[in-house]
UniProtKB/Swiss-Prot annotation:
Top-level taxon of origin: Eukaryota
Membrane topology term: Single-pass type III membrane protein
Transmembrane spans: 5-25
Entries under Pfam families matching the protein: Ost4
Cytoplasmic compartment residues: 26-40
Keywords of this entry: Endoplasmic reticulum, Membrane, Signal-anchor, Transmembrane, Transmembrane helix
Lumenal side: 1-4
The name this protein goes by in its record: Dolichyl-diphosphooligosaccharide--protein glycosyltransferase subunit 4
Quaternary organization: Component of the oligosaccharyltransferase (OST) complex.
Organism (species): Drosophila persimilis
Function statement: Subunit of the oligosaccharyl transferase (OST) complex that catalyzes the initial transfer of a defined glycan (Glc(3)Man(9)GlcNAc(2) in eukaryotes) from the lipid carrier dolichol-pyrophosphate to an asparagine residue within an Asn-X-Ser/Thr consensus motif in nascent polypeptide chains, the first step in protein N-glycosylation. N-glycosylation occurs cotranslationally and the complex associates with the Sec61 complex at the channel-forming translocon complex that mediates protein translocation across the endoplasmic reticulum (ER). All subunits are required for a maximal enzyme activity.
Length: 40
């Protein structure tokens, strides 16, 4: 069975990964949105 400590570590790692994924998505989305009008 999964212990409380293992569950806490898993949830923390998953939370950090999802947070970084959201930050990376917004960073990429913001850069492509600003650079497209300049190229045109």
């Amino acid at each position: 069975m999964i212990t409380d400590v293992q569950l806490a570590i898993f949830s923390n790692v998953l939370g950090v990964f999802l947070f970084l994924l959201v930050v990376a998505y917004h960073y990429i989305n913001a850069n492509t949105g600003k650079s497209s009008p300049k190229a045109k």
